[in-house]
Amino acid sequence: MPEKFIVLDTETTIDFDTPLCYDLGFAVVDKAGNVYESHSFVIAEIFLDEELMASAYFIDKVQTYWKEIKKGQRKLVRFSTARWTLIDTMKKYGIKIVMAHNARFDYRAVNCTQRMVADPKWQYFFPFGTEIWDTLKMAREAFGKDEEYATFCSEHQLQTSNGKTSFTAENIYRYLINDATFEESHTGLEDVLIEKEIFAECVRRGITEGKLW
C-alpha cells in the first residue's frame, strides 16, 4: 500500500497574528496525488459569529457557503468535530505527515482556533508527533531553477511585487495546467485539490521531503 499523507487548507479571519479558521478542508493522498478520502468543514464557532466573519478574507463567499452546506457539499460542524475527524482519519490510514502550502500560516490558524474555541486542555490541533510539511518549501526547491516556470511567470506577469518569481499555489497550478487565467477558489477543500497536485509534481521532480521544522 502506498504511503498516505494529509493535505490541508484553511480559510480564516483577517488577523495575521491570530487567524481564526472558518473553513477547513483536507484530503488523504498518496505521492502520485490520488485522493482516498476528503472532508470539507465550515467551522460553526467562527462562521456563525457575524463580528468575526466581518474580518474574513473572503466574506463575499458567505452566501455560497450556505448554499453548499444546504446541498451537503460542506458540513457545518464544531471545531472539535473537525479536529477529531482529522485525528480519526490519520489513525485509519496510519498517517504521520500533514502538509499545506505555506504551512506556517495554516498551522498557526488551526492552533489559534483550537485555543480560542475548543477544550483548553488541548493546546495544539494536531496529535503529538505529527510532522508538518510545507509544499511551498518543496515547490521552491522543485521549481526554483526551472527556467520554463520563471519564463511563464514573467510572460504572464505572475511575479511578486519586487519582480521575483512567485511560488503561490495558484501560480504554480497555472503553470502545471498551462492556463494563466486560472483562479483559486479560496475555499479549503478546493484549494487542497490544487495543492495535492503541486505535491505530486514536486515528488515527480525528486523533492520527496518537505518538513517544516
Regions found by a protein language model. Name each.
Residues D15-D17, R140, E197:
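Conserved protein kinase catalytic core
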Residues I97-R104, R108-A109, C153-W213:
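Acidic, Mg2+-coordinating catalytic module of metal-dependent nucleases/exonucleases
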